[in-house]
């Protein structure tokens, strides 16, 4: 999918990241700030925007690949397929490209995936993962959108039909300065964030 420029401002964006619904719920509840990602089937890798993006919940493969004990309590039944509920957005504080599987266990306190699902994701196509440190924001009023067939498929990023306002919303959880230092202690210096399509 081609990600179009010019659809994000300081107050609104149409860019959205697809993620398992249980992980999205955990992020917006303050349970986690870390995602472990791989690009979709048609993507060369995982690109990272510098600006805000919506957290777009999906249910594909969630039950099969699994969330850990902290994440499992956020799993909800799949809603009607003709709507999507958007409850929050995020920015990326830092990203890391991880090539060493020995670094997976030290990350377990900060993400919501089972060890088996992380290892499967790491080994898919080529051994690597992108580690994301997010700053999530919860909308005061969630937005329900009609589903769009263009959102289907195995890709990480999509655009909503139109930009949605980012406010009113509030930051979820404590500041991530300490967590970033902890992750840098495991993974080293963070990567330079690049936009999708770069």
Q: For each predicted feature, which ranges?
A:
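Structured alpha/beta reader/binder surfaces that contact nucleic acids or chromatin modification marks
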Residues: 2-198
